[in-house]
From Swiss-Prot:
Record-linked InterPro entries: HerA-like (IPR008571), HerA_barrel_dom (IPR018538), HerA_central (IPR002789), P-loop_NTPase (IPR027417)
Pfam family, one: DUF87
Transmembrane as UniProt keyword: no
Gene3D superfamilies membership: P-loop containing nucleotide triphosphate hydrolases
Disulfide bonding pattern of the chain: none
Keywords linked to the UniProt accession: Plasmid
Protein name in UniProt: Uncharacterized protein aq_aa31
Length: 270
């Protein structure tokens, strides 16, 4: 419920008339529709302090499938905030919290517990067994993920998030519907004029596009470390562009022969 009790029980003593039960059920459904919130299976967690316009952190709630570089969304009244997970940390709020870090002083176990296990005279195998036993009997574990904000989707356009949203907002795995609204749009928020497929989003079958009109009419620089896939991306883009439009002419300066073998089928012998 958005206000009032989180949980509520209703007891009704019927006089045997089904009509009373029917009216009560209709009334309850009306209240539920107006004031309750259903999170759904795509819920990943809830935001925690601090939330910034550039990034936010959230506690994961039982979803072990989510990983680095996954895309997430936060649904607000003014739009949908899009983010990309950049880190995930696993924490233990009991014995395995660091007792020598002041920031965790309120959650770590008593130092005496460490002295008991790591004191002199204890066999190494005994120490391993003691720690393993504690770990498997301790339920005070959680994971916290950090996500960089990509922007906020408003009326089909991707804009900069200028103000932080509230702590405690639900965080969801990004939906295909949301991705479909942005993957064929350019940076201005308009639909791509010539969308060219260059790959798929990691761990999915969702296609990713580049607006060929933006590339051809302007300058584009492909940057990356050695082995990150600069040449592969460029070859993929050129081949997809040539397949989508036979009238396009591309000139490649290839002193090291990186492109010839992969693109020779597109060469006009004349």
């Amino acid at each position: 419920m958005s206000t009032g009790n989180i949980e509520a029980g209703v007891y009704y003593e019927s006089d045997g008339s089904d009509e009373h039960i029917k009216k009560l059920r209709e009334y309850f459904e009306k209240i539920k529709e107006e004031y309750s919130e259903s999170f759904g299976d795509d819920l990943l967690g809830f935001t925690v302090n601090p939330v910034k316009p550039q990034s936010f952190e959230f506690i994961l709630v039982g979803n072990d499938d989510i990983g680095l570089h996954s895309y997430v969304e936060v649904k607000l009244q003014e739009g949908i905030v899009l983010g990309k997970i950049t880190s995930i940390f696993a924490y233990d709020m009991g014995f395995f919290a660091n007792p020598f870090t002041s920031q965790e002083s309120s959650v770590f176990a008593p130092v005496e517990d460490f002295k008991t296990i790591f004191s002199k005279g204890k066999d190494d195998e005994w120490k391993k067994a003691a720690i393993y036993a504690y770990l498997n009997n301790n339920g005070n574990k959680l994971k916290i993920a950090t996500a960089d904000v990509i922007g906020i989707l408003k009326d089909g356009k991707l804009d900069i998030l200028r103000n932080p949203f509230h702590v405690g907002e639900p965080v969801y795995k990004i939906s295909e519907k949301t991705l479909g609204k942005i993957l064929k749009k350019n940076f201005s928020g308009r639909d791509m004029e010539v969308p060219v497929k260059v790959g798929v989003i990691e761990n999915s079958d969702i296609d990713v596009f580049v607006d060929a009109n933006e590339v051809i009419s302007k300058h584009m620089l492909v940057l990356g470390t050695t082995g990150s896939g600069k040449s592969y991306f460029t070859k993929r883009f050129i081949s997809s562009l040539l397949e989508s439009d036979k009238e396009v002419e591309v000139y490649v300066l290839d002193p090291h022969g990186e492109y010839f073998n992969d693109l020779k089928s597109y060469i006009d012998e004349n």
